Amino acid sequence: MIKLFDIVKNLNNKLVYLIVVLMVFMFYAHTLNYPWRYFDERIIYDESILPIPRSFLEILDYIKYFGIHNHFEASNPFYSTISNLRGTPLDVVFNFIVFLCFKKNPFNYHLFSLILHILNSFLLCLILLTHCKTYIKKSLSISDFQRKAVVIVMTLGWAFHPTNIESILFATNFGALITYFLCLLVIFYYLKNSGNKTIPIHLNIILFLYYLFPLFLNEYSVTLPIIVFCYLIANYYLVQEEVGFKNHLISALKQITPLLISLMIFVIYFFSLPAIRTTQEKNLIVSLERVFWFAPQVFMHYIKLILFPLHLTIDQTGLVQFSESLFKPYAIFCSITFIILCLFLLISFFNLKKNTAYLFFIIIGPFFLSLLPFLHVLSPTYCIASERYLYFPLLLLTIGITNFLFLLLSSINKNKQKLVILVTVLLVTLTSCRAYARALDWKDSYSLFTSALKEAPNDLFKALRLEFLGSILFDYSNTTASKQKGQELLTTAIDTLYNSLLDLEYKKLTYQNQLTLIIKSYGLDPKTMQAKVAYLLAFTKIGIDKDSISAYQILKPHMEDLSIIDTQIIDLYLGLLFNNYLFDKAEEILNKAIKHRISPTTLTIMSQLQALKYKDMKKAEHYLKASFKLFPYDVQTLTYLKSFYQQTNNYEQFAYYSFLYGIRMHSIEDLKNSYKTYVSLNNTVMAKKSLEYISSIDKAN
């Protein structure tokens, strides 16, 4: 779409780009050999959401038999009770292609993420070098060397910022990095052509189709058209002062029209899907509290994280500070700051000819808009805060600050210029050192969870990471000493959880009724936190003792109000009820749970209930098919389907779902069952297909 290297015309500029690319690579090169972490990266190496195809033909088979409308639940019982169903057709196809290329080798994913980060760093450098020079005052200009030095320092300042470590080293984050790369290309294109009042029709069509890709790949790019609009309107005021505001506005809107049409199509698609969100706000007061009380405190947390990136952890959600009531000083301060910021942005929008207004708008506007999807303003999401959410907002903030630096440097004498550059270099050096230390935290699972344990904000998160560390040592270590240490960590986690239950009981009696509705809606109140603690306690104890009765007794007192309980907690509780043959109680829970949350577990257990208690095989089949429709790649659903048809002597369907399970899990045993059954049914086509997969898996093994 853009001939980037038309811009790179002289050796000096090429040298700047080369320095940036080499330094970014050298800084992160040691991370390429990092192993898988026992974290969300299990999604890849355990193939828990999608299988890893062995060939392109296998991708076609997956699409043929399973389809591309796959959903997965985005939730974390320890972060919040918010739960979202996610999944787009493009996401499924794209992941299949990536998995086909990289298989289960962590090096491939780390290299891919690093390449994307280098490309994003290059594009940032390109924008700073070619676009931001426009904002240097002509009267007291800075030298070309100083300009390029500032560009290098600011680019590396972003590339080495500590909050970006998670985005780069978290192997499952490649989709977001690609989305940001595509968004950066769009921004660069518009900045490069901002002097043109109109865009040719064929380029409008290309932009329209192009923007659909990042939209359907990742919803993080929904505010891109408004971000581009900010840059366009600001640039018009700077370089075309004779043109009026109305003409500026109309021209900018015309230029982003293809992006707005793409966004409109995405929004229509998004809201046309059934059960997009499994937890919904039905109270206007809760929504208002989320936007004007909750979001400002999340925003303030991100500002502190950018300026002082000291407390870095995968559990950043737990570090967000919320007031205990609506009118506490900190909450009021955050809300007022948030509202004033929005008002100042609006005022600066109409006063861009003034330097102060322009600088405020160009620094804060794009940054704020890019952060908006993560502030819980547009919609509630399960993860309250995460370091990786700052990747793109911080990049746009860097562009704005660089504009300010250029204006500042071109307004002061040489001695002050040197001082400003020196201070900037020192700040970047400090943050780079912190980033390198943070990168070492990610070297393996043990160090990652140890770092999270050190930053644990409360007993729940402390016990959670103790449980992870204990499980890693107990389950995966080969030495007796390590297994013993793992057992000790698990015991410590259990003791911590019992203490937490008592502490939360005191807090519940003290200020449960003072808390805002939005805090309760997110499950951050003592009552809901007790349920989370009980869940982790039951989960840990059943893993050690295998005692489902004891686990049931721990969880039972906290399962009265299912509307505040996360899906994973409900799933464990239902499993415990079935293990203890409490079918009536399980049915009561299921009938309540299925109204609030849909998951493979609730649907498959409902199927079991219909079959075991009521002997109603049609309803049992209905729930299994409903689960398969929403979650076609879900292993639990496929397991229950083939078992159901085997028990009901439906051999054709048994063969079919055995085949699906076999290709989903690369299971030779199930493919053999499928082959034998298809042979007995004289279905030579599917029998041959099963045999081909058996041979393919044999060769791969």
Predicted feature locations:
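Polytopic membrane enzymes that build or remodel cell-surface glycoconjugates and lipids
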Residues: 2-480, 484-508, 526-539, 543
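C-terminal luminal/periplasmic domains and tails of membrane-associated envelope-modifying transferases
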Residues: 3, 7, 450-701
